[in-house]
């Protein structure tokens, strides 16, 4: 017997706002370039969805980046280097976040339909509270306002793939079982968050960080090319 869903928990950037998830990509690329390391788009996007410090630490441990860092600085990067890059990353991201808070196409209509069905809207994010204090009000002005949001700050820094932000949502929304909740996101860590919480999980393809195209780039493609991009994103 299927359990009726009572809530949907969405991710933010790349899922409900910021088509293509470009705000963090821009900031990550900028701070690594400032440090003399030019990351590829694949390297920048692979850890997307994690807590941002964890994202930087993961990038520093990628074989090519680690080797480039060792050549430039004479030692392998560690926690100290991640701290230094994050100290530059946060202000770089905060400076541009309000430009990347527009709801993606069909998000407002989807949320409206879900609420008509009596379904509550929760959300989790890899952003910090400070970042969300910019994104959430900007998105609300444009019509998107979930019933609640939780960042890794609410769980002692235990962000994705840990499921604890999801459980915070369930508590706030007064949902008694993970079987009554659906998790939606656009990154591998989003999917793992939902799976680790033991709930039905959906991956977004169009406008996702994994696909990495702007709305204009995607809409300029033929239907065949769009389908090819969607299939590639599934891999």
Predicted segments with their positions:
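Asp-based, Mg2+/Mn2+-dependent phosphohydrolase catalytic module
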Residues: 1-6, 108-113, 128-235
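N-terminal helical cap/lid subdomain that shapes the substrate entry/recognition surface
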Residues: 3-108, 112-117, 133
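Residue-level detector of anion-binding/catalytic polar loops
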Residues: 38, 120, 200
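Conserved residues at beta->alpha junctions
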Residues: 47, 123-126, 185
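Glycine- and other small-residue-rich loops at beta-strand/loop junctions that grip anionic moieties
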Residues: 100, 124, 158
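Short active-site oxyanion
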Residues: 119-122, 179-181
């Amino acid at each position: 017997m299927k359990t009726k869903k009572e809530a949907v928990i969405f991710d933010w950037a790349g899922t409900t706002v910021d088509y293509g998830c470009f705000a963090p990509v821009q900031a990550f690329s900028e701070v690594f370039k400032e440090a003399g390391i030019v990351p590829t788009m694949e390297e920048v996007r692979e850890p997307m969805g994690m807590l941002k410090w964890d994202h930087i630490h993961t990038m520093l441990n990628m074989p090519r980046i680690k080797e480039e860092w060792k050549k430039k600085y004479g030692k392998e990067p560690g926690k100290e280097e991640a701290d230094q890059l994050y100290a530059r990353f946060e202000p770089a991201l905060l400076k541009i976040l309000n430009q990347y808070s527009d709801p993606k196409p069909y998000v407002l209509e989807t949320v409206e339909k879900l609420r008509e069905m009596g379904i509550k809207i929760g959300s989790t994010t890899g952003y910090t509270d400070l970042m969300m204090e910019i994104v959430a009000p900007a998105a609300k002005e444009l019509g998107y306002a979930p019933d609640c949001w939780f960042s890794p700050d609410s769980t002692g820094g235990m962000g994705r793939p840990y499921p604890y932000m999801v459980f915070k949502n369930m508590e706030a929304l007064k949902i008694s079982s993970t079987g009554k909740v659906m998790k939606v996101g656009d990154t591998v860590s989003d999917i793992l968050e939902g799976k680790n919480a033991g709930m039905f999980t959906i991956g977004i393809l169009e406008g996702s960080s994994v696909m990495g195209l702007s709305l204009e780039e995607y809409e300029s493609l033929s239907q065949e090319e769009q389908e090819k991009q969607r299939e590639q994103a599934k891999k």
